[in-house]
Amino acid sequence: MTVIDNHEALAKEGDNGLSEAGARDYFELLKPRVMSLVVFTAFAGLVLAPGHINPVLGLIAILCIAVGAGASGALNMWYDADIDAIMTRTAKRPIPAGRVAPSEALAFGLVLSGFSVTILGLAVNWLSAAILAFTIFFYAVVYTMWLKRSTPQNIVIGGAAGAFPPVIGWACVTGNVTIESVVLFLIIFLWTPAHFWALALFKMGDYEAVGVPMLPNVAGVPTTKNQIVAYAVLTAIIGVVPSFMGFASLGYGVVATVLGVIFVHCSISVWRMPDGDVKMVPAKKLFAFSIFYLFAIFSALLIDRLVAVLMSGGVGGWL
């Protein structure tokens, strides 16, 4: 079945009326694994920002950011249902599996988008709400509907959507965007290509089948390997910048350096993969470590902040 045929089949399926979707199916539309990373980095931005926020408002902010991220995930699944049905990695998602009708997923995503942005604006501030609205739009429209199927630089440019959560968290506390929040943005933005291109290497067949122009399919594996190393190096460099800005301690800088060296080492292992390697073990290891790297970097920033607060004689600066 081609992408066009599958799109038409899904459209007809959506015209048959409401599905019998359960709460779990709608939860899957939110892309919970992606949401967990969004929530964590947003929380980091909120905690690391100078100043204080009422804990209740902080909780509302995190919930709104989580719901907004889930909403963009639902809109992404709605639009990509045709190719999701063909790719082995995504074929069991709620829409291609027939558990949720496309129209329901669209309505679900739109309602959650409006709800999350409105509540964040009313409860916290409108700058953070505006950035959240832009993030949802960028991911659902700019990336999903345009970049993903039109350019091999899709995840480079589209990666900005995943990099905004710490900026939103920061804006919730400060009401503005500063250079420190931009650094948090850049850590995720520069990390994204190596992370997703590692996945694209061992999922080339899937992307080829649906015509998504991922870099390995368009520019070839050697070029992709070079780009992965380049972005891994950039990620390692930006990862230590907070310690040089006085935004984090030397201890954090040491941890970030070690993590960065391992990240680059994993990328070099991918670069050294022989041509025609079917198993792509180094690429799979890089993909797995990249997830750990991002969680570890932001965890290190949070721990560094907590230690600084405790050493200053209290926990009042934690939130």
Swiss-Prot record:
It is a multi-pass membrane protein. It catalyses: heme b + (2E,6E)-farnesyl diphosphate + H2O = Fe(II)-heme o + diphosphate. GO terms for biological process: heme O biosynthetic process. Keywords: Cell inner membrane, Cell membrane, Heme biosynthesis, Membrane, Transferase, Transmembrane, Transmembrane helix. Pathway: Porphyrin-containing compound metabolism; heme O biosynthesis; heme O from protoheme: step 1/1. The keyword Transferase applies. It is found in: Cell inner membrane. GO terms for cellular component: plasma membrane. CDD domains: PT_UbiA_Cox10 (cd13957). NCBIfam families: cyoE_ctaB, PRK04375.1-2. Carbon 2 of the heme B porphyrin ring is defined according to the Fischer nomenclature. HAMAP family: CyoE_CtaB. Belongs to the UbiA prenyltransferase family. Protoheme IX farnesyltransferase subfamily. PANTHER family: 4-HYDROXYBENZOATE SOLANESYLTRANSFERASE, PROTOHEME IX FARNESYLTRANSFERASE, MITOCHONDRIAL. This is Protoheme IX farnesyltransferase. It comes from Rhizobium rhizogenes (strain K84 / ATCC BAA-868) (Agrobacterium radiobacter). The lineage of its organism: Bacteria, Pseudomonadati, Pseudomonadota, Alphaproteobacteria, Hyphomicrobiales. The gene is ctaB.
